Amino acid sequence: MAERTLLDQQAQGFFEELWQRGDHWEFDSSAFEQARYARLMALLAGRRYAHVLELGCGSGSFTQHLVGLAGHVVALDISPTAIARARAQWAGPATVDFRQANIMEYDLQAEGPWDLVVISDTMCYLGWLYSFFDVSWFASQIFAATRVGGYCLFANCMGEFGDMLMLPWLTRTYQSLLRNVGYHLEVEEIFRGTKYGVTIEVLISLFRKNSALDSNGAS
């Protein structure tokens, strides 16, 4: 328990320090990020999601896009500075609830089930900060908190550009966790673009939580 508490403190300290410096990842200003958001929204288009959970929302850059398809969004991030920035930048209706929380300690099912769960560029950091068992268990909790017929949108940068957290095989390991806990993979795409002067790929996966009948029929 003491070790887990220390991990939680280290996780918050890491992200809080980055956000206190500003938009480290250039989520608000990067053309690459805006193009990525557009692609993610295109995959989600055509449906209405009444109850949406975003895990690792940062300053709310993608959250602002989600609102157009959602009835209500709960957006979580571990950094108090990121959440303060998200709230300050949000000028829309009161359908978005930005909350400071450690998603690894958050009860995902308490307000569920969710029609859509979004986890973008988050699993790679969880895999670095926490044990593989902890991340695997977290994936199972995402699935359990999703409504039957609901969706999970997973996206993560990957490439051979020196960032060990985003090695392609590692990113696909996190994708496989979501498949193994019970989701059905409906769409997989690779989005490519340039950021920081290097070519980056994004593995995008749209999962659906089928009913037991659907799953048996699919097999």
Locate predicted features.
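Class I (Rossmann-like) S-adenosyl-L-methionine-dependent methyltransferase catalytic domain
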Residues: 1-55, 59-110, 129-143, 151-219
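A short SAM/SAH-binding and catalytic strip from SAM-dependent methyltransferases
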Residues: 116-132
